[in-house]
């Protein structure tokens, strides 16, 4: 915590908030630009420039810590900027940039107003940046709602299709219900403790809470809200429908930014609030993890829609990540291992959904989401098929990919903390997942259909979206073979947490 004068404190606060301020400023500029003149290229470029400036400003914030010799900066009681928040802010901004690159060609064929897409995306990104830096439940709620409200519009952006409208309405209704649970749980905690900051709640939870039913009920309500947002069983039923109905770039954003930001916020909350002091909470988390892994993987087996399949797959992946939450106070390396898994999941998801976006651009009605659309892709787009194969193998956790390193680290955490049921569940779930990931992979190399329904442009590898897919595949391979630079990079950030 900083002990300098008020003026210096204010200056450091503003510097620490630089990425958030830049994204917020870009939102204002974009609104003015849209009001002045609708120009897709200009407004899309403004969005990308703003996000790049926010990304590079993270280096300035990182340098601020070394210059000021502080481990963290508390920006009001709501936000805490440290290595942890800088790392996850970087992942959020990278995923938002990737979404912009996938969305631009898709919007080129869109028959209505295009610029609002970038505005909604920026507001949602702003919420994600607030969420990963939150140290107060009020900031958590603000961040979650800033992510969710623009997503209602993004999910229904292809409103000419009934499925897109259905996805938006389903997410709206269920998200509102989950937010109600979250808010009611926070109210219960406040009624019992008189505070909502993570520090004050942590002090309460370090005492015995058996005799405080409001705290137990409040934590249960909050767990329901978090479970919905992370699409964990039994709050997951919206996920496949929303993934399938949303436009491909929005599915990319929802599956990466939305979930990664929330997981970062939830993990920071549980860093202060030890789960082992709350009766039944670890048991509930373990049940949600096991059920999510089995449900997600088993339901994905029979899917013929790639976006729906990835929706079920994401349920399983965040079931795996629950190991990190359960073992948070039992393994000193758990933050680094979860971060490696998040990086692997991010780049693998960007790669697969990036290929779907490339195949679906420009807008021509329904996305190229049927598995049949990818049959024989190798025979007319061999490099794209190779890239997609790498990403699918990484999601499956096959050796020589980053996904294998990430899953190995999570298994190591489960073994070190004696979570034997979860260890067995991860092994069985991974074996099931191997089938449906290989099913997609094999179809890429089968004989192609006589007529191609959807295809990428011939110069896809030189487009912005193609470059993102290339880079993602390269990182997944390089860090899968030699992960030490990534691990050292992550440890450097966690040293300031």
UniProtKB/Swiss-Prot annotation:
<keyword id="KW-1133">Transmembrane helix</keyword>
<keyword id="KW-1003">Cell membrane</keyword>
<dbReference type="Pfam" id="PF00361">
    <property type="entry name" value="Proton_antipo_M"/>
</dbReference>
<feature type="transmembrane region" description="Helical">
    <location>
        <begin position="281"/>
        <end position="301"/>
    </location>
</feature>
<feature type="transmembrane region" description="Helical">
    <location>
        <begin position="309"/>
        <end position="329"/>
    </location>
</feature>
<keyword id="KW-0813">Transport</keyword>
<feature type="transmembrane region" description="Helical">
    <location>
        <begin position="385"/>
        <end position="405"/>
    </location>
</feature>
<keyword id="KW-0830">Ubiquinone</keyword>
<keyword id="KW-0520">NAD</keyword>
<dbReference type="GO" id="GO:0048038">
    <property type="term" value="F:quinone binding"/>
</dbReference>
<feature type="transmembrane region" description="Helical">
    <location>
        <begin position="14"/>
        <end position="34"/>
    </location>
</feature>
<dbReference type="GO" id="GO:0050136">
    <property type="term" value="F:NADH:ubiquinone reductase (non-electrogenic) activity"/>
</dbReference>
<feature type="transmembrane region" description="Helical">
    <location>
        <begin position="253"/>
        <end position="273"/>
    </location>
</feature>
<feature type="transmembrane region" description="Helical">
    <location>
        <begin position="116"/>
        <end position="136"/>
    </location>
</feature>
<protein>
    <recommendedName>
        <fullName>NADH-quinone oxidoreductase subunit N</fullName>
        <ecNumber>7.1.1.-</ecNumber>
    </recommendedName>
</protein>
<feature type="transmembrane region" description="Helical">
    <location>
        <begin position="420"/>
        <end position="439"/>
    </location>
</feature>
<feature type="transmembrane region" description="Helical">
    <location>
        <begin position="86"/>
        <end position="106"/>
    </location>
</feature>
<feature type="transmembrane region" description="Helical">
    <location>
        <begin position="215"/>
        <end position="235"/>
    </location>
</feature>
<dbReference type="GO" id="GO:0008137">
    <property type="term" value="F:NADH dehydrogenase (ubiquinone) activity"/>
</dbReference>
<feature type="transmembrane region" description="Helical">
    <location>
        <begin position="45"/>
        <end position="65"/>
    </location>
</feature>
<keyword id="KW-1278">Translocase</keyword>
<feature type="transmembrane region" description="Helical">
    <location>
        <begin position="137"/>
        <end position="157"/>
    </location>
</feature>
<dbReference type="GO" id="GO:0042773">
    <property type="term" value="P:ATP synthesis coupled electron transport"/>
</dbReference>
<feature type="transmembrane region" description="Helical">
    <location>
        <begin position="338"/>
        <end position="358"/>
    </location>
</feature>
<keyword id="KW-0472">Membrane</keyword>
<comment type="function">
    <text>NDH-1 shuttles electrons from NADH, via FMN and iron-sulfur (Fe-S) centers, to quinones in the respiratory chain. The immediate electron acceptor for the enzyme in this species is believed to be ubiquinone. Couples the redox reaction to proton translocation (for every two electrons transferred, four hydrogen ions are translocated across the cytoplasmic membrane), and thus conserves the redox energy in a proton gradient.</text>
</comment>
<feature type="transmembrane region" description="Helical">
    <location>
        <begin position="171"/>
        <end position="191"/>
    </location>
</feature>
<keyword id="KW-0874">Quinone</keyword>
<feature type="transmembrane region" description="Helical">
    <location>
        <begin position="461"/>
        <end position="481"/>
    </location>
</feature>
<comment type="subunit">
    <text>NDH-1 is composed of 13 different subunits. Subunits NuoA, H, J, K, L, M, N constitute the membrane sector of the complex.</text>
</comment>
<comment type="similarity">
    <text>Belongs to the complex I subunit 2 family.</text>
</comment>
<dbReference type="InterPro" id="IPR001750">
    <property type="entry name" value="ND/Mrp_TM"/>
</dbReference>
<dbReference type="GO" id="GO:0005886">
    <property type="term" value="C:plasma membrane"/>
</dbReference>
<keyword id="KW-0812">Transmembrane</keyword>
<dbReference type="InterPro" id="IPR010096">
    <property type="entry name" value="NADH-Q_OxRdtase_suN/2"/>
</dbReference>
